[in-house]
Amino acid sequence: MKLSLRRKFKGPKYTIGDLSIDGTFFCNTIEDVIRELPDSCPNTSRWIPCKCKEKVYARTAIPTGTYKLTLEYSPKFKRKMPYLHGVPHFLGILIHWGNTEDDSGGCIIVGENSVKGKVINSRATFKKLYALLEKEKDITIEIY
């Protein structure tokens, strides 16, 4: 299964995107603001939090790229969640529910972008996405 996240609107504090599954539109997303980051981080590959000056903790969208996605247990959510592997500068990046970039903390929030600067119906959208993901073994997400 291939997920694609096309970032289409870059606001002053948030980024809105379209998430597609195998080429078909599925939902909208909201993330933090995009910041220019170095190509790699010497810390996160060793599971040490990023200290790069360009990154603002919990206020920066993840870099563009293609990432492996698996369902992993999240202590915060107390359940399995879609987890992105190998994201430079970031640890613990998930796809989850929320409404604004304040709920993101660097993660990807799914929902419907029918209100400026937020997504709605996020929990219902997440449940539908999760039901599709849990049937798959080989999942990637391309972010551009």
Task: Annotate each language-model stretch with its function.
Residues 1-139, 144:
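Cell wall/extracellular polymer interaction/catalysis modules
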